[in-house]
């Protein structure tokens, strides 16, 4: 109501964590089946209306002052880490999400709840790519004992916006270049 009355639009980010990860390839109509508080709270926070857009996704990238993200954790980890071959996700780097918003959302009337995703990838394969692109020379030990698939199917959003996410190699290269430019910017301060 507030958005309609003020002629503003709300863009809200939800998460793939609203799903328990037992089956993967969740589409826009899949019902949340998670039992933890984080996932439940994100699901309850999803908004739907004429002036609202909720994007379900998973973000990867760099943080400014901490190392809690998967990528920053990996950069700061020991020379040998575990990489889970059966932990599947389909999120996007923050730089690609910013590009998507700028190119496909801000000037559109898009509203509703949609999944925003890349091709599914395992945490092992993702860390392997980051290791190569960032030239880290770390050893990633494949582990298959942790199984979860929170991949999202975003075909409906792709069809509406004509957006095709880049392949994972391109996404990681974009993330790395953004990381380098952010480092240069922070060093100027």
Where do the language-model regions lie?
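Mid/C-terminal beta-alpha module of Rossmann-like enzyme folds, strongest
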Residues: 100-154, 183-184
């Amino acid at each position: 109501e507030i958005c309609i009355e003020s002629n503003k639009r709300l863009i809200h980010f939800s998460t793939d964590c609203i799903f328990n990860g037992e089956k993967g390839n969740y589409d826009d109509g899949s019902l949340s089946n998670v039992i933890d508080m984080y996932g439940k709270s994100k699901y309850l926070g999803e908004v739907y209306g004429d002036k609202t857009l909720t994007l379900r996704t998973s973000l990867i990238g760099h943080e400014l002052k901490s190392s809690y993200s998967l990528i920053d954790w990996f950069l700061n980890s020991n020379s040998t880490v575990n990489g889970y071959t059966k932990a599947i996700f389909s999120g996007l780097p923050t730089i690609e999400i910013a590009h998507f918003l700028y190119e496909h959302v801000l000037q559109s009337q898009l509203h509703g709840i949609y999944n925003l995703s890349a091709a599914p990838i395992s945490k092992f394969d993702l860390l392997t790519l980051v290791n190569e692109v960032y030239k880290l020379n770390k050893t990633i030990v494949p582990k298959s004992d942790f199984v979860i698939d929170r991949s999202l199917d975003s075909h409906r959003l792709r069809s509406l916006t004509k957006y095709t996410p880049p392949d994972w190699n391109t996404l990681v290269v974009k993330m790395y270049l953004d990381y380098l430019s952010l480092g240069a910017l922070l060093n100027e301060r």
